[in-house]
């Protein structure tokens, strides 16, 4: 038997073992107190659970830079029979991560997709106004939302919802914009953020609170593999073709830009890698502005 067969066998064994782990119900770990007037990072999650999957950078902004992370539940899923339960699961997951939670409207926004944007401008405009109001109320330093080719219709719809809502802000409004990926990989990420083993375990644990979803499909157990593949992709997509890959175990890929003067602008040339050993303030100093 080669060592690689043993390696793959152990991976399969661990995933099988993970299917027996408890789902949710874990006590939140202790965290530093976030100042009441701390700068805010808003995660605009197309579905309950996205905050746990793409939240590696948000978790580090909370811990290393003292930002208050607020998860905005753009929708609560399309299954109306599950929406109340999904809100309860989301509340528990955010509580575990130390994220605040904000609703858009009772039950979440509906029909967040490009078809609605094109065919029902009145409905779309009302949804955009909900998001625009939240941006104005929270005045975030940083916002997270999916990139424009993230495959899932609600993810792509959320991208356009945010861009349209940003366009409704006052001319002086500015914030860092972090585009995320999950269903569809970005062709041009420019930031790879390492997560420590502890952080990955916390995100997996939080994801397990979404009991109804992971019982149906235990995708929470595959998050580490996804984050390992991000290291492979990011080594060249962010670091440059043919370049040396960073010595990361797990990472998340993002596209970092800034909204200012009514448009999105890149904030640095090329790609950046943020190791777990380097404080996020050294890479994203503007993200911590008051």
Task: Tell where the protein language model's regions lie, with residue ranges.
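A conserved mid-domain beta-alpha-beta active-site/ligand-binding segment of alpha/beta enzyme cores
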Residues: 184, 189-246, 251-252
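Glycine-rich, flexible loop segments associated with nucleotide phosphate handling
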Residues: 124-127, 176, 245-250
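Flexible domain-boundary/linker segments
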Residues: 58, 107, 160, 179, ...
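Active-site cores that bind ATP or allylic diphosphates and position pyrophosphate for catalysis
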Residues: 171-176, 182-183, 200
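Acidic, Ser/Thr-rich low-complexity intrinsically disordered segments
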Residues: 245-268
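Active-site beta-strand->loop->alpha-helix modules in alpha/beta enzyme cores, enriched
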Residues: 1-173, 185-186, 205-209, 261, ...
């Amino acid at each position: 038997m080669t060592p690689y067969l043993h390696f793959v066998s152990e991976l399969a064994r661990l995933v099988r073992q993970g299917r027996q782990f408890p789902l949710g119900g874990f006590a939140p770990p202790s965290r530093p107190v976030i100042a009441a007037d701390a700068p805010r990072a808003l995660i605009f999650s197309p579905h309950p659970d996205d905050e746990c999957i793409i939240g590696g950078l948000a978790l580090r902004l909370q811990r290393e830079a003292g930002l208050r992370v607020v998860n905005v539940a753009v929708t609560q899923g399309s299954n109306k029979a599950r929406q109340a339960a999904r809100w309860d699961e989301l509340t528990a997951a955010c509580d575990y991560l130390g994220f605040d939670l904000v609703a858009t409207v009772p039950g979440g926004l509906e029909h967040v997709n490009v078809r609605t944007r094109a065919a029902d401008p009145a409905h779309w405009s009302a949804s955009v106004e909900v998001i625009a109001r939240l941006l104005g109320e929270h005045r975030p330093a940083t916002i997270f939302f999916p990139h424009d080719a993230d495959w899932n219709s609600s993810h792509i719809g959320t991208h356009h919802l945010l861009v349209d809502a940003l366009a409704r802000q006052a001319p002086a409004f500015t914030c860092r914009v972090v585009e995320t990926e999950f269903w569809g990989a970005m062709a041009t990420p420019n930031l790879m953020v390492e997560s420590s083993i502890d952080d990955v375990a916390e995100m997996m644990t939080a994801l397990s609170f979404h009991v109804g979803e992971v019982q149906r499909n235990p995708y929470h157990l595959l998050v580490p593999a996804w984050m390992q593949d991000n290291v492979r992709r990011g080594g060249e997509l962010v670091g440059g073709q043919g370049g040396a890959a960073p010595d990361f175990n797990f990472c998340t890929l993002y596209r970092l830009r800034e909204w200012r003067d009514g448009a999105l602008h890149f904030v640095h040339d090329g790609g950046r890698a943020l190791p777990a050993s380097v404080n996020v303030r050294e890479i994203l100093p503007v993200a911590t502005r008051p």
